[in-house]
Amino acid sequence: MAYERFTSAITLLMHWRNRLDPYWKLARGDRPVGFLLLLWPTWWALWLAAGGVPPWWTLCVFTTGIWLTRSAGCVINDYTDRWLDPHVERTRIRPLVTGAVSPRNALLMFATLMLIAFGLVLTMNQLTVLLSVVGLFLAMTYPYLKRYTYLPQVYLGLAFGWGIPMAFAAIQGKVPTQAWLLYVANILWTTAYDTWCAMVDRDDDIKMGAKSTAILFADLDLTVQGVLYTLMLFTLCLVGLRATLSHTYWISLIAAVALIGYQFIIARRREPTACFRAFMHNNWVGMTIFAGIALATTH
């Protein structure tokens, strides 16, 4: 009898696991690097704004909110890309393409995730709540950009970095110049690393009429990325000077230079697999810079 109950419980768990698995994949729960690429810049901002470890509730709200909004962004991105994803090698097995998740359920999932995230934001001050409305607009409009402009990666930077001014607003009640410098650095970084991802899909995107910085930059892609990364690091130097950060921050920037250089080495032939590795490698760049900021602001 006990064995039968145990077997029934396992069967039920497997049933729900199989039912929920497509939704987990739709939210990119199986691919945490995207979450981390959004997390690190927000943590940069939280630690800089607080001058050290931020208040625990603010840290919890932003960390959870990042996961929720990133997941929601992936859902709405796949919903709007239903015309494109079946024709792109990297995306043709996504749940909306295979029919594992219906478009209606995807929209319900997006709305649910955003409502939970907004509920968390409501525990912050008024300025943070107002800024979150802009963040919602950026998240909802980004997926449509690849139809109309070659710069969706720049717009992704605007959306991915919006947690930076929100973090300063939540802790300081204002968004100082330092926050906007950090925001600009993140836009440059996001544009650079997402261009690696766009290079993976470039041939398929050209066939389908989609647009990206990889298509715009063409043979100059590596050169322009080098410029973007250089400008990002220069802007981060301005952030460090303005915040009078200690030597650990500057050491982290030197380490970031080495990590970025490695990306160009592995992707120098523009092979799709190598370009995707370079994209994923940016997680280490973000983590290294965060470590430098955290150590530099520890008293």
Curated annotation (Swiss-Prot):
List the EC numbers from the record: 2.5.1.39
Q: Does the keyword Membrane apply?
A: yes
> Catalyzes what?
all-trans-octaprenyl diphosphate + 4-hydroxybenzoate = 4-hydroxy-3-(all-trans-octaprenyl)benzoate + diphosphate
- Per its UniProt record, what Gene3D superfamilies does this chain match? UbiA prenyltransferase
**What is this entry's stated membrane topology?**
Multi-pass membrane protein
Pfam families in the cross-refs: UbiA (PF01040)
Q: What metabolic or biological pathway is this protein involved in? A: Cofactor biosynthesis; ubiquinone biosynthesis
Which function does this protein serve?
Catalyzes the prenylation of para-hydroxybenzoate (PHB) with an all-trans polyprenyl group. Mediates the second step in the final reaction sequence of ubiquinone-8 (UQ-8) biosynthesis, which is the condensation of the polyisoprenoid side chain with PHB, generating the first membrane-bound Q intermediate 3-octaprenyl-4-hydroxybenzoate.
Q: Which family does it belong to?
A: Belongs to the UbiA prenyltransferase family.
Designated name of the protein:
4-hydroxybenzoate octaprenyltransferase
The protein's organism comes out as Xylella fastidiosa (strain 9a5c)
Q: Which gene encodes it?
A: ubiA
